Amino acid sequence: MARKTERVILVALNEPGVLGRIAGHIRHEGWNIKRLIADEDEVPAVAGDDGVSEGNKTSTIEIDIEGTHTKLAQVMERILNLNCIVSISMIQNGEKIIRHRPLETKKSEKVEEPAVKTPPKKTGSFRILAINPGSTSTKFALYDDENCILAKTIRHDSAELARCGALLDQKELRRDCLLKDLKAAEVELASINAVAGRGGLLKPIESGVYAINEKMLEDLHSATAALHASALGGIIAAEIAGQQGIPAYVVDPVVVDEMDRNAKLTGMPGVERSSIFHALNQKAIARRLAAQLGKPYENARFIVAHLGGGITVGAHRYGRVIDVNDGVAGEGPFTPERTGAIPVIPVINMCFSGEYTQAEMIEKVTRRGGIKAFLGTSDVVEVEKMVYNGDEFAALVLDSMAYQVSKEIGAMAAVLEGLVDAIILTGGLAYSNRFTGAIKQRVDKFAPVHVFPGEDELLALAGGVLRVLRGQEQAAHY
């Protein structure tokens, strides 16, 4: 079939990573992006972390895309479901088509859209509901085996979340919004075979698919787990599953700990290195590459770098992550908003200077460091626009982050004794050819470099549960 080029004009809210999310959806459908222009500047498509900028400022994005099929309207319809999109215009069969959606909503649920009827479950397939709560959103998707038949992101109003009080008290609000969307899509809960929830800050566990039990629910309600909205994933999953008499699971939560003993030791007794990283996405992408290479993940030696608002680089040896930088506690490369590893004595001096509280220092390390501290933004799309417009300091900062990622990959190559089958770059920042190119230039002598831009944690959740339902993997017990 002859390839053809279509031009699409999007109006989108100025959100972090908006270009990357749009580009990811288009590429996922089998189209190639030939040109992408935003705000009259040609910039690479890069994705950052989820988040909504204050106000309703918009950008006009012009894309030329090339593909071998004629399903562009369906692709654009799915892109219109992204909360960042205000309108889409395109030419279809010689006719200009314009689709709009309201700029904002004050409700916790998404702007009302025409109900999309979910197709009936195929005979012999497994239907899995996957739930991934974020700080101000709840993402969910419905899968028939590996096929996504419904996916939504519910944006919650910050003021309404605040009225709930404690984070765990948001459960009813988020659950009810999710159930409302399922009902609007005519999904019968009785058609679902299992529910997967994003696991929170549980006790350290090995990688796997874990059946949610009373002990896990107790820990998900603990003070530590309640620090992050991901705890609500397991709680809501268990509640929905319990009402239907079906199993609920979590898959590879951030606390997966398979580190070698000598990787945990530090030079200060009483302070050990912890394994807190993007386990779900790292493991899922590693399995995907292993399948492409025709090699079981359990027989592979990979280095996986998750590149996003947080950056973690893991050494995967025969199915286990034997070393990885702690993406929260200040290890590894600096990131769009985290400091990464920094000299300790100057930090001690800052802590005892009397200028900062403990909370302020933690904020500086985890949310106001890295690129944001240097350039005032954590949005790498904006940083690349600065570089494109000739900002030499912005180029230095971005290239320094790539340098530090490369150095961390080199460290993990040493952990694997130089025997590396492949290096994987994934996460939102992997959409940037400039950023991944700078890393490749330094590390491609260690092993072939494979780039998997973006992440699909909902698919990873569903995929883990599907392996259990098919009998390919046994569920672990917490």
Language-model-detected regions and their locations in the chain:
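A conserved regulatory-domain signal marking ACT and ACT-like small-molecule sensing domains
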Residues: 1-110, 115, 204
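Short glycine-rich, Thr/Ser-proximal phosphate-binding strand/loop in the N-terminal lobe
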Residues: 38, 128-169
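N-terminal phosphate-binding loop and adjacent alpha-helix
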Residues: 150-188, 216, 220-225
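Short beta-strand-loop/turn "lid" adjacent to the catalytic site in phosphate-handling enzymes
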Residues: 182-229, 247, 255-267
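Glycine-rich phosphate-binding loop plus the immediately following alpha-helix
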Residues: 231-239, 250, 265-301, 310, ...
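Adenine-nucleotide phosphate-binding core of ATP-dependent small-molecule kinases
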Residues: 363, 367-418
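Glycine-rich phosphate-binding loops at beta-strand->alpha-helix junctions
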Residues: 420-439
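Glycine-rich phosphate-binding/hydrolytic loop that grips phosphoryl groups
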Residues: 430-431, 437, 450-478
